[in-house]
């Protein structure tokens, strides 16, 4: 690629998937530029590596670009896309650039509606512990490296495979993981769940004859597509059919202890401690163990990496104990969960990790279409918290949909009668609302995928200021 392409421009460079690819390209020696609507820690990091960044979108930002990479959120009428089209500069989706990177290494691609980021991070951490120095591109910040991407010297590249726009079908990995299949991003698939499942079948069928499909046998939709898969399959899960199986699962102090049974020619067992809470994370760890086993990683490296795993940014990220107004302390957690299934798993993990404590959930819905399609499920999962603070929907470029907004959710939760929700106009107001409400011993979870990402940090900052200054002085 490099003899023809020297300058790569990213439209929407601040997104987690885009920024990771940009960072790898910078480390490979390419000239990188990009634009986004707002400056953030990710764009500042890329600027530190030498990327030329622009706030906002304009045709002149293209400069001498040889190719333009766009995220699925970028529209056809974006001025940079229009200018690239007029100048006959190739315009490619993010996944196609990721596929180009994967061509020169052995690819491990992780797909699924939920759990992609954590599973990808666990695999990268295990391979790093084994001395295999992988390249990785992750949809969140891997705390151990402080980044969502890294160019390694090893032969493997570990990356998330995005089904939201079906672009994961561009990838050509040697190992493909499917964590689960759920009804999300249904606009892409014409609101036809069978089409969505068919895309996952095609994703797995793109494996070479020597490739391996690592799949969660516990997920009913994954199980349903297995008869259509002609490649080698490594099923994992809690069920007896799993060849990588967890048993004796116990939660303790925010960690999970379990026994792994691996059936791969011979049967072996070993005990694991995972430095994350929740059974859903155990499933993610089993996927990582399956991949590592396929690559002949020693069990010692697997055990050590899982026990020492430092987590991923905004995936049950713990901010520690935060001062409450009543003189005590509450536990603050930040999470990216934005689909009811993910939220339910996070709440269950919090109940296991902090039994008997009041659970306060501050949530920003993401996309009007998802809110509409999963409305009743959102009402149910939000009603399972003890206290609910809800903001308006983060549009992600979508037009508002009647009866699929934040206030409609609040009304429906109130009618359900299990909890009295509080509507907070904007995420910027959430930190103060949380501090007004949180009590000693509470567990406060800030959750969502939109503009809520800085709320937990701001809440902690304001609480620590208020601990030393009368609250009236900081209002």
From Swiss-Prot:
It is found in: Cytoplasm. It catalyses: UDP-N-acetyl-alpha-D-muramate + L-alanine + ATP = UDP-N-acetyl-alpha-D-muramoyl-L-alanine + ADP + phosphate + H(+). ATP binds at residues 112-118. Pfam families: Mur_ligase, Mur_ligase_C, Mur_ligase_M. It comes from the Bacteria. It is an enzyme of class 6 (ligase). One of its GO terms (molecular function) is UDP-N-acetylmuramate-L-alanine ligase activity. Its main location: cytoplasm. GO terms for cellular component: cytoplasm. One of its GO terms (biological process) is cell division. Pathway: Cell wall biogenesis; peptidoglycan biosynthesis. NCBIfam families: murC (TIGR01082). Cell wall formation. PANTHER family: UDP-N-ACETYLMURAMATE--L-ALANINE LIGASE, UDP-N-ACETYLMURAMATE--L-ALANINE LIGASE-RELATED. HAMAP family: MurC. This is UDP-N-acetylmuramate--L-alanine ligase. It comes from Methylobacillus flagellatus (strain ATCC 51484 / DSM 6875 / VKM B-1610 / KT). The gene is murC.
